[in-house]
């Protein structure tokens, strides 16, 4: 799946046959299709053909930087670059990132809504969990509540716990049962209409160490002060 945006603002989509009807429902009207699945050529020859319609020595930007996707293998990209040496292949990540920073009112509303849903579910979770439940049980309740409250899907959910704290926040929830003095963290990424929220919450079980409470309160106060800026 490729989207070609010319300097003059014209947009062309290159998509596999299975994606044609979906793209036709958007504002994009200039669409070219390749028959897929085709492991030997998933659109790369079509992409090369379109690039060749541009003047030689043109700059062809690809998203090559942080948090970007080529939508092709590195091997395929290097082959295209080798076959089209009369063009300048450059990293356009900075352009895309600068555009992504600008949000329309509708985009902001989508982000606000998915964040509000997730915050509400986090707040209600305290009434549904207790000592003796496992990380997996708690995570399952949380995920179900997210869906029931309107998010489209959960991109990821990590969960960890331990006495006075935890040592990682990247793994899936385990069968570990929450005991006295445990701190549980849930870190989630939920989406709505393609827009994303990413934040976490901590929950204390039983008698929590005073140093842990003090550290939490300091972080809370620092966050609140920052939000006032």
Name each region found by the language model.
Residues 1-229:
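Active-site neighborhoods and metal-handling regions in enzymes and metal-associated proteins
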């Amino acid at each position: 799946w490729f989207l070609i945006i010319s300097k003059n603002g014209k947009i062309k989509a290159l998509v596999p046959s299975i994606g044609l009807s979906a793209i036709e429902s958007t504002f994009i009207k200039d669409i070219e299709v390749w028959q897929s699945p085709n492991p030997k050529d998933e659109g790369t020859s079509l992409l090369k053909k379109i690039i060749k319609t541009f003047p030689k020595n043109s700059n062809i930007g690809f998203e090559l930087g942080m948090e970007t996707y080529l939508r092709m293998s590195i091997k395929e990209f290097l082959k295209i670059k080798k076959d089209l040496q009369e063009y300048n292949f450059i990293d356009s990540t900075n352009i895309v990132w600068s555009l992504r920073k600008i949000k329309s009112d509708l985009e902001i509303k989508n982000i606000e809504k998915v964040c509000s849903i997730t915050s509400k579910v986090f707040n209600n979770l305290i009434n549904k969990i207790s000592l003796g439940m496992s990380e997996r049980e708690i995570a399952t309740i949380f995920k179900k509540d997210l869906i029931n409250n309107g998010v489209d899907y959960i991109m990821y959910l990590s969960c960890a716990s331990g006495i006075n704290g935890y040592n990682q926040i990247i793994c899936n929830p385990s069968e570990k049962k929450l005991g006295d003095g445990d701190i549980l963290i849930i870190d989630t990424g939920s989406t709505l209409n393609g827009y994303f929220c990413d934040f976490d919450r901590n929950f204390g079980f039983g008698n929590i160490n005073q140093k842990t409470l003090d550290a939490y309160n300091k972080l809370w106060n620092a966050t609140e002060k920052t939000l006032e800026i």
